[in-house]
Amino acid sequence: MLYKLLNVLWLVAVSNAIPGTPVIDWADRNYALVEINYEATAYENLIKPKEQVDVQVSWNVWNGDIGDIAYVLFDEQQVWKGDAESKRATIKVLVSGQFNMRVKLCNEDGCSVSDPVLVKVADTDGGHLAPLEYTWLENNKPGRREDKIVAAYFVEWGVYGRNFPVDKVPLPNLSHLLYGFIPICGGDGINDALKTIPGSFESLQRSCKGREDFKVAIHDPWAAVQKPQKGVSAWNEPYKGNFGQLMAAKLANPHLKILPSIGGWTLSDPFYFMHDVEKRNVFVDSVKEFLQVWKFFDGVDIDWEFPGGKGANPSLGDADGDAKTYILLLEELRAMLDDLEAQTGRVYELTSAISAGYDKIAVVNYAEAQKSLGKIFLMSYDFKGAWSNTDLGYQTTVYAPSWNSEELYTTHYAVDALLKQGVDPNKIIVGVAMYGRGWTGVTNYTNDNYFSGTGNGPGSGTWEDGVVDYRQIQKDLNNYVYTFDSAAQASYVFDKSKGDLISFDSVDSVLGKVKYVDRNKLGGLFAWEIDADNGDLLNAINAQFKPKDEL
């Protein structure tokens, strides 16, 4: 009798048993919506975008009932439901993130749940990454003026000799970061200006192999997405390099807008061919594709140097034709970005870096161009340099110097030219030079006006002759006599023993630019280039040296 009772109780217990605990099988659960080929040198082979990833999961039940219905949970949210007997599932994932995945098995008596396993789905919005926080370095101080644009250029090649990766950029103090530079594919006759830099033309041809001319690409895939850097150094990290760090840094700085700058001094040649609508269409479509692939970007900056010519390639330039092409190009880019906004729900900016030379401003109808542009980055620097040993002057200045009141290459003259064309002052962003330009062997000057003399060539530079980083100027300041021209709002240093003369932006001159921007209700300031600063100049842009109400 007792035996029969125990047998009945055992049958009841079995019939009322919830499923056994599922154990998820081991597997590599790192996925990417944009796959990177780490062996590739050509952009066409570098990336493989996907609309979704298929996350495969299988499980076993080592003891007990296998259940009737199985569920797969991501962070406790159901993402799949099916027959428990299959012991496997495929989940289609369309977004990035790190998810705790569990399997839940159920029957009429209840459910059991597995231990979690981590699923990592990477995408170029960086949703799979931990935020890359900035550690305050050198003289940088926290504090950003939120009422003005505060932007800076970061260069792709800065990770090499300059040893200045993204994690060294004081991003909390910037509203915009401009990534220099994104190239446009094309070989002989299309990118000839690039041949002036040893190896750079050849590097672009490797990256553009198999890619149609006039499509954008990445110039240096190793620096951009393959080089291990802080926060993106794991062997299985899908996006390393500058791009990977920018994705992570943006998570820590959600206010930040990052724009790829297309063109630049030696990469502007292809723009001169875009009077051809077919070439222009190829370019615009490729920019759209680029933004769809690299989701951390917030728009595009066009740095055509320069419509009308007088750029790195003296054989290119047609003032009337380029002026029309520039307007058309901006209109078509803006229309493309509008379509992309409608598709994604995001906001995409279109900006342009332009020369501050009055003669180059006169080529373009900026009143018309501004209809497509959110901001105009006025490159108010490189006015003078060691390309001339007889025409010495301020390489960056707000006003004309007292010793040359007829000087037209000034920030004020450029701003005034744009305002007279009808450009919205709030769209004008004034440039700060985080470097100096200079001469050596300066002689034959009069009345201690060193700029009235003649030079004997470019002075010793930080990375190239005649160009000195602000950081180095500040470090070597005791070797010079420093002068601030308060009338022009410009700075320079001079070493009489060597005749070394450097014109540069100092804290004094940058504060002068800040006042000028505020007084004229301009949109803000930007800098070329952030790796050359020790923090002094960016602090000055953000008005750290004086309260805002004293400006």
Curated annotation (Swiss-Prot):
Presence of the UniProt keyword Isomerase in the record: no
Report the principal subcellular site.
Answer: host cell
| Signal peptide span | 1-17
Q: Which GO terms describe its cellular component?
A: host cell endoplasmic reticulum lumen
Residue ranges, annotated region (Chitin binding domain (CBD)): 1-149
Task: Give the Gene Ontology MF terms in alphabetical order.
Answer: chitin binding; endochitinase activity
Q: Which residues form the active site?
A: E305
Compartments (UniProt record) = Host endoplasmic reticulum lumen
- Entry EC no(s): 3.2.1.14
Q: Which InterPro entries match?
A: Chitinase_II/V-like_cat, Chitinase_insertion_sf, ChitinaseA_N, Glyco_hydro18_cat, Glyco_hydro_18_chit_AS, Glycoside_hydrolase_SF, Glycosyl_Hydrlase_18, Ig-like_fold
Q: Motif location (Prevents secretion from ER)? A: 548-551
What keywords were assigned to this record?
Carbohydrate metabolism, Chitin degradation, Glycoprotein, Glycosidase, Host endoplasmic reticulum, Hydrolase, Polysaccharide degradation, Signal
Q: Which reaction does it catalyse?
A: Random endo-hydrolysis of N-acetyl-beta-D-glucosaminide (1->4)-beta-linkages in chitin and chitodextrins
* PROSITE patterns to which the protein is assigned, alphabetical: ER_TARGET (PS00014), GH18_1 (PS01095), GH18_2 (PS51910)
Attached carbohydrates are found at: N173, N444
Checking Pfam families in the record gives: ChitinaseA_N (PF08329), Glyco_hydro_18 (PF00704)
Q: CDD domains annotated for this entry?
A: E_set_Chitinase_N (cd02848), GH18_chitinase (cd06548)
Q: Where is the GH18 domain?
A: 148-548
Biological process terms from the Gene Ontology for this record are: chitin catabolic process; polysaccharide catabolic process
Reply yes or no: does the keyword Flavoprotein apply. Answer: no
Family (UniProt):
Belongs to the glycosyl hydrolase 18 family. Chitinase class II subfamily.
The role this protein plays is: Plays a role in host liquefaction to facilitate horizontal transmission of the virus by hydrolyzing beta-chitin and by regulating the cysteine protease VCATH. Localized in the host reticulum endoplasmic via its KDEL motif, interacts with and thus prevents VCATH secretion before host cell lysis occurs.
Subunit info here reads: Interacts with host VCATH.
| UniProt name for this protein | Chitinase
